[in-house]
Amino acid sequence: MSYKFLYQNAQIKSRESKLLTAQAVQRLLDAADAREASKALAELGFGTDGENFDVVFKRAEEENIALLKEMNEGGALDAFIVESDYVNLKILLKAYVSGAKAESFAPNGLFEVETLKEAIESGEISLLAKQMQDVILKTQENLASGQVKAHALDVDVDKAQFAHQLELCKKSGKVAKEYFEKRINYLKISSFERARRLGLDFTFFADCFI
């Protein structure tokens, strides 16, 4: 067993020990205000007392993506890293169709945010993954025909993301593929329950089906 693997395993175990327990989550939920919640987070090892939540969360995201990239041997973790790209793609596409300025991006995944932005604005999408190309083209076509809907855009990007992740799982192995398949199934159940509670018809649920 290589020392590199042992080091990586130790890093993961260290982070696992810092995960929020059910009691810690309840403590945050019970906080009277943002100040008290910030103090609780600091005591749990996340940020410093009084630090802005967005700063704490953004730093944690950046650290996690950096760790995944550091440990990404042969692209085995690409399926996990690329999720950050789809968060950014969704932000950029929503800004593109609304004419607003895109802000508050997730950390760069396999692609730079600027690369995604330039591809959307210029139409030069050949350097992107096929799933990304397809969802960009579909969004642009919907925009041209006046058929863009925020919910539909969310669903289109989510479908592209999971299709891409399942494809990348060829480099990750069986366990990763099973993980993403379970996530997809949980999302289907969540979508069905949401549609049921809101009294929406089957068509709405079917459109969300990944």
Residue ranges and their predicted role:
Residues M1-I210:
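N-terminal domain-start signal
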